[in-house]
């Protein structure tokens, strides 16, 4: 037996159970706002229970998981944590809508070296706000305090979402055909992708994040939360014959649009059909980034690209605008030769 007679505790090792309990108490109100009628029980159990909505005849579950990448570093640098949770939810639920999925519930994972209750509460409150916007329930999560794994105030977050879609209504891209119109749904900014390049542009250019651009600081532009499209997109899906939806995330236009196109087709994008939001022009200028690289890294103002019959395009655009979205016809689907690129921007 060791000669040391002092008694060690978990707190001595850097894990504060009391802080974790305080966090749970702080977030209960925010979590309650997200509740759906299908949820069974409250937070704090080992597992969370959720029934399937009764309106679905042949329900198929659709799931997704994601993080917010190095946008988190900007949030840490600027000490602004109340919107990063919205980003986390958006990155998951916007992937579900690609297949027509209605988000049901969301779980989060928050990891840090030393738990700061105020910071964590801000993050979880943002997650709850994102869930409210998406119409899904925040039914559980994990807060991991891991001394020695994270430096200083650093933390990381991950999210997991489950949704449901009617089997007969799954959107899988198989109906996409030459002559289909392409609709763009506007983004709120860079969303949660391309931030390693953004941070490199800031570093190389020596730009000040407090510099103003169109009445807001660069930091505010860059931390603008990712837009959640669920409610407007579900309404569009209910009223129109949607052939495919692409969520423009990491890899930009070149990587994401081909993921929903069948072989032998390509998306022909009219690059003159919209003006990039100012933050993208600023990034391109400050970083001397080539246009091809911009489209391969950022959404350049386009959060979703939707394929549908040409004769429904105008009505779908008007529906989206009525729902508060910025939407426009951005191009069309054409036939593609074997080996030809599936995205062409004119």
UniProtKB/Swiss-Prot annotation:
Pfam families, alphabetized: AIRS, AIRS_C
Keywords: ATP-binding, Cytoplasm, Ligase, Nucleotide-binding, Purine biosynthesis
SUPFAM superfamilies reported for this sequence: PurM C-terminal domain-like, PurM N-terminal domain-like
Localization, UniProt: Cytoplasm
EC top class, as a word: ligase
E.C. numbers: 6.3.3.1
Intrachain S-S bonds: none
Example of a GO biological process term: 'de novo' IMP biosynthetic process
GO CC terms: cytosol
Gene Ontology molecular function: any one: phosphoribosylformylglycinamidine cyclo-ligase activity
Pathway: Purine metabolism; IMP biosynthesis via de novo pathway; 5-amino-1-(5-phospho-D-ribosyl)imidazole from N(2)-formyl-N(1)-(5-phospho-D-ribosyl)glycinamide: step 2/2
Major place of residence: cytoplasm
Catalytic activity field: 2-formamido-N(1)-(5-O-phospho-beta-D-ribosyl)acetamidine + ATP = 5-amino-1-(5-phospho-beta-D-ribosyl)imidazole + ADP + phosphate + H(+)
HAMAP family membership: AIRS
PANTHER family: TRIFUNCTIONAL PURINE BIOSYNTHETIC PROTEIN ADENOSINE-3, TRIFUNCTIONAL PURINE BIOSYNTHETIC PROTEIN ADENOSINE-3-RELATED
Similarity comment: family membership: Belongs to the AIR synthase family.
Protein name per Swiss-Prot or TrEMBL: Phosphoribosylformylglycinamidine cyclo-ligase
Gene encoding the protein: purM
